[in-house]
From Swiss-Prot:
The protein's name: Gamma-adducin
Residues carrying N-acetylserine: S2
UniProt subunit comment: Heterodimer of an alpha and a gamma subunit.
Main location: cytoplasm
Regions of compositional bias (Low complexity) in chain numbering: 590-605
InterPro entries with a match to the protein in the record: Aldolase-II_Adducin_sf, Aldolase_II/adducin_N, Aldolase_II/adducin_N_sf
Organism (species): Rattus norvegicus
Interaction with calmodulin, as annotated region: 683-700
Entry annotated with the keyword RNA-binding: no
SUPFAM superfamilies in alphabetical order: AraD/HMP-PK domain-like (SSF53639)
GO molecular function: actin filament binding; calmodulin binding; protein kinase C binding; structural constituent of cytoskeleton
Region named Disordered: 1-22, 472-495, 535-556, 572-612, 658-705
Length: 705
């Protein structure tokens, strides 16, 4: 192949059927002044404008009075429900209020199309005319309308649910005509009296259906114990109401209903004779009323009990319709013995929650636990029912020993600063330290066991080796509290400001970086205890009041004198003992003179003066000057003399001679005619070894001579 053919590039044109993709510039007009202003705007300024728009929407939501009142209601409900340390339920309800969308994982209602109207809309309505407990009752009734819509019980005509809110005044709440069950809210309900006169119109302008309200009013006037009435006529209930046999005892649901009353309903209960007949049919305890060829009515002392009966009636009617159609007639069905099963089944259902009250401390009313579960489902779907739960779904976790009040296990491992990036090499280098820390903080307790070693032959060796084994009873081995630390903030108190925690941590780390001497942490147990310490011995500090320190004897020596003194010490160490012997002989002669002086006490002062002159000459012969330390020079010289002659060793034959020198004052005291000494004896015998620098050197005496 040629070079021209090898360099040729083959391009494929796009298919003609490809649709034209709309671009960004096709949707805008470049001559638009708004577009030109945004285009010429700096990116930072454009971002600031976008943030301002977002904050504006958030500010509008936060400043709305409806949001504020609803938030207060949520907080009050959360406080009544129990202690929830995290507060996730309240935050979830706030998110439901802002977004008003269905939660992920739950199917949206068919009529809501992903958006639902909140049931509890009372914070924005006027509630001054409400009686005690009416807010909660309105929320329950509106929630029950929503449940009837979700279950498919809604009907466009004569299907209503009513609740009596005031037994003294006979005020009844019902939904107005023209408002569907899916639109029912707490504020949209209408409050009327027993004869149908409007007491509170609610948030709508719709009126009630008097023909549909007449059965409710008749039942309330007949049965003072009834608080809620639910009237439905679904396909199953209407079909069973048209059967001569009525509700057959062929299922558990039919046995739960108890006594069932039947009444020939003609469309209204306005006449007095009809109401008297209804009162005879219902009796004092009947909770289910079948209206012939019309539908079913369920009664209850509470709203939860009425829902319990209407739900079981609907299920029993559906089972009966399916059973009759499948069996080919009532004669082919197995009818249960009412005398044998009805009392037991009805009694279990009346205990509340299907018998969950047996052996439990919490007593549930009839149908309350099931209704609370349905309200929780509606709240999860975003309906915001406003229902006051008796018990939250999530049980509070038991307090573990690794909570805040128990301190952490002390280790020497410290975490790196969050602001400083950690290199991979340093991270790998600290791997061993992290493994050690994890082992130290392990909740397992180990004990040291000596295990005999095994030799290569398989025989047991007399030597032992140390092995760490897990202790079965930690209380006998460990005295601490081993805690497995999984989170660095495990012991940080809850509901604290993270900024304050970081500032406190950084402050502690700054103190650790500097070598500060402090008294350490103060014990909380020993803080109030006072310890009586014995008085310590007095010590003089370096101040003006203390006694002066002795001066340095070498401070006045010249360099030459110090060198000669050093050489003298070196000669002595080398074994030059002849000079020492001569100096000792001279010292012995002086000692003999002193002994003669002590034998004649009358001439002691004169002899002392002569000895003083002799000693001064002998001191000058030595190159080391004498430093006088004391008040009186005479007394110091005598002290030096006593120190010199106290311990002299002339030879092996000459013994140590102890000489006591008395001062002139002491001599006068002894020789005083009165015999009473003027001063107390303060000086005692002193025994010192003659310093080496005071000994005479024979060679130096010859040089001086």
């Amino acid at each position: 192949m040629s070079s021209d053919t090898s360099q040729a590039v083959i391009t494929t044109p796009p298919p003609p059927s490809m649709p034209h993709k709309e671009r960004y510039f096709d949707r805008i007009n470049e001559s638009d002044p708004e577009y030109l202003r945004e285009r010429n705007m700096s990116p930072d300024l454009r971002q600031d404008f976008n943030m301002m728009e977002q904050r504006k929407r958030v500010t509008q939501i936060l400043q709305s009075p409806a949001f504020r009142e609803d938030l207060e209601c949520l907080i009050q409900e959360q406080m009544k429900k129990g202690h929830d340390p995290t507060g996730l339920l309240a935050l979830q309800q706030i998110a439901d209020y802002i977004m008003a969308n269905s939660f992920t994982g739950f199917s949206s209602p068919p009529l809501s199309l992903g958006m639902v109207t909140p049931i509890n809309d009372l914070p924005g309505a006027d509630t001054s005319s409400y009686v005690k407990g009416e807010k909660l009752t309105r929320c329950k009734l509106a929630s029950l309308y929503r449940l009837a819509d979700l279950f498919g019980w809604a009907h466009l005509a004569n299907t209503y649910i009513s609740v009596r809110v005031s037994k003294e005044q006979d005020h009844i709440i019902i939904i107005p005509r023209g408002l569907s069950f899916s639109e029912a809210t707490a504020s949209a309900l209408v409050k009327v009296n027993i004869i149908g006169e409007v007491v509170d119109q609610g948030s709508t302008n719709l009126k009630i259906d008097h023909s549909g309200f007449s059965p409710h009013a008749a039942i309330y006037s007949t049965r003072p114990d009834v608080k809620c009435v639910i009237h439905i006529h679904t396909l199953a209930t209407a079909a069973v109401s048209s059967m001569k046999c009525g509700i057959l005892p062929i299922s558990q649901e039919s046995l739960i209903l108890g006594d069932v009353a039947y009444y020939d309903y003609q469309g209204s209960l306005d006449e007095e004779e009809e109401r008297i007949e209804l009162q005879k049919v219902l009796g004092p305890s009947c909770k289910v009323l079948v209206l012939r060829n019309h539908g079913v009515v369920a009664l209850g002392e509470t709203l939860e009990e009425a829902f319990h009966y209407i739900f079981n009636v609907q299920m029993a009617c559906e089972i009966q319709v399916q059973a009759v159609a499948g069996a080919g007639g009532v004669d082919n069905l197995l009818i249960l013995d009412l005398q044998k099963y009805k009392a037991f089944t009805h009694g279990v259902a009346m205990t509340g929650g299907g018998g969950v009250n047996m052996g439990s401390h919490q007593k549930w009313k009839v149908g309350e636990i099931e209704f609370e579960g349905l309200m929780r489902t509606l709240d999860n779907l975003g309906y915001r029912t406003g229902y006051a739960y008796r018990h939250p779904l999530v049980r509070e976790k038991p307090r573990h020993k690794s909570d805040v009040e128990i301190p952490a296990t002390v280790t020497a491992f410290s975490f790196e600063d969050d602001s400083v990036p950690l290199s991979p090499l340093k991270y790998m280098a600290q791997r061993q330290q992290r493994e050690k820390t994890r082992w130290l903080n392990s909740p397992n307790t180990y004990m040291k066991v000596n295990v005999p070693e095994e030799s290569r032959n398989g025989e047991t060796s007399p030597r032992t080796k140390i092995t760490w084994m897990k202790a079965e009873d930690p209380s006998k081995v460990s005295s601490g509290t081993p805690i497995k630390i999984e989170d660095p903030n495990q012991f940080v108190p809850l509901n604290t400001n993270p900024t304050e925690v970081l500032e406190k941590r950084n402050k502690i780390r700054e103190q650790n970086r500097y070598d500060l001497k402090t008294a350490g942490p103060q014990s909380q147990l020993l803080a109030g205890i006072v310890v009586d310490k014995p008085p310590s011995t007095m010590r003089f500090e370096d101040d003006d009041q203390g006694p002066p320190a002795p001066p340095n004897p070498f401070s006045h020596l010249m360099e030459g004198e110090l060198e000669e003194y050093t050489k003298t010490i070196e000669r002595k160490q080398q074994g030059l003992d002849d000079a020492e012997q001569e100096s000792l002989s001279d010292d012995a002669a002086s000692v003999s003179q002193i002994q003669s002086q002590t034998q004649s006490p009358q001439s002691v002062p004169e002899r002392l003066e002569e000895n003083h002159e002799l000693f001064s000459k002998s001191f000058t012969s030595v190159d080391v000057p004498v430093i006088v330390n004391g008040k009186d020079e005479m007394h110091d010289v005598e002290d030096e003399l006593a120190q010199r002659v106290s311990r002299l060793t002339t030879s092996t034959t000459i013994e140590n001679i102890e000489i006591t020198i008395k001062s002139p004052d002491r001599t006068e005291e002894v020789l005083s005619p009165d015999g009473s000494p003027s001063k107390s004896p303060s000086k005692k015998k002193k025994k010192f070894r003659t310093p080496s620098f005071l000994k005479k050197n024979k060679k130096k005496e010859k040089v001086e001579a």
